[in-house]
Amino acid sequence: MELTCCNYYGKECFERNLLLSTPTMDLLKKISTSFPDVFILEPRVFGDERGFFLESYNRKVFAELGITHQFVQDNHSRSTRNVLRGLHYQVQHAQAKLVRVIEGEILDVAVDMRRSSAMFGKSEAVALSGENKRMLWIPAGFAHGFRVVSAVAHVVYKTSDYYAPEYERTLLWSDPQLKIDWQLEGEPIVSAKDQRGVKLRDAESFE
């Protein structure tokens, strides 16, 4: 590969060429979870005294990891400590999600809602933060939610389909059957809508 500085000068030119010369698979580390199709993505971070640079999305790299979805929507939420959102999913226009935190920390949770899955009703909880810069890939067929661990958290995520409120469903976050350890610190802050979520035994699901 021919490396050029283009409009980059000095140290920035060196860093750009370093990025271009890095094998694509080395730009993003794939970490397994208890689900074969849910995984953590850890980007390579280029940092110095000025700060850092990373690629949060690269279509080619993601395709090499098996993620070929076309993302159609980006969402950004700001929440304060102990806010709990979820567990949300859409029974039609089901969404795959790529979740990351740009500031603060959350406990991110995915619940398998596919009745044909041996893991139906099971969950995965992952710590995502602005510090660890990890992302969580959640395919369609899962309910998703998170609890804020830090004082404030900014969560951004890509979706593979548009928000469709008429098909949105909420799984009750506190359903004992789910056995989710939210690592609570007192009573969480939950919207009235999420408090009205249904238990797994009564929830609409996927095949």
Protein language model features and the residues they cover:
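Compositionally biased, intrinsically disordered/low-complexity regions enriched for serine, proline
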Residues: 17-20, 136, 185
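Short, Lys/Arg-enriched N-terminal segments with co-localized hydrophobic residues
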Residues: 11-24
